[in-house]
């Protein structure tokens, strides 16, 4: 299972451990990923995702999964999130018509 957020696309970063003597050794910084089930109001079902805590806070701040997907540009979304956004947009268009 890859260590990438399914909503934001946030992944691992590479850096250094730095000792007191300023010796540098390579290390990786991993995102804090959580397995969550988010409810989509438009689709009327729950969606299981592996999301970073930063992504989860963003979703809650914007008032839910559907609102967050609609407000976020496609260039900032991962492939799974773009697919989910397309489904939500289609359902919202059907409800509006």
UniProtKB/Swiss-Prot annotation:
Q: Entry's Pfam families?
A: Ribosomal_L28
What InterPro entries is this protein classified in? Ribosomal_bL28, Ribosomal_bL28/bL31-like_sf, Ribosomal_bL28_bact-type, Ribosomal_bL28_sf
Keyword Ribonucleoprotein assigned:
yes
* Keywords recorded for this protein, A-Z: Ribonucleoprotein, Ribosomal protein
GO cellular component terms given for this protein: cytosolic large ribosomal subunit
In alphabetical order, the GO MF annotations are: structural constituent of ribosome
Look up keyword Ribonucleoprotein and say if it applies. yes
Annotated GO biological processes are: translation
What is the superkingdom listed in this entry's lineage? Bacteria
- Read off the NCBIfam families from this record: L28
- Say which family it is in: Belongs to the bacterial ribosomal protein bL28 family.
Instruction: Name the chain's protein.
Output: Large ribosomal subunit protein bL28
Q: Which species does the entry assign this protein to?
A: Sphingopyxis alaskensis (strain DSM 13593 / LMG 18877 / RB2256) (Sphingomonas alaskensis)
Upper taxonomic classification of the species? Answer: Bacteria, Pseudomonadati, Pseudomonadota, Alphaproteobacteria, Sphingomonadales
């Amino acid at each position: 299972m890859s260590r990438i957020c399914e909503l934001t696309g946030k992944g691992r970063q590479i850096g250094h451990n730095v000792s007191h003597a300023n010796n540098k050794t390579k290390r990786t910084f991993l995102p804090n990923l959580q397995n969550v089930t988010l409810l989509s109001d438009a689709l009327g079902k729950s969606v299981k995702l592996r999301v970073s805590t930063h992504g989860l806070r963003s979703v809650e701040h914007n008032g839910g999964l559907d609102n967050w997907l609609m407000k976020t540009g496609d260039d900032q979304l991962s492939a799974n999130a773009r697919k989910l956004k397309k489904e939500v947009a289609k359902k919202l268009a059907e409800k509006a018509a």
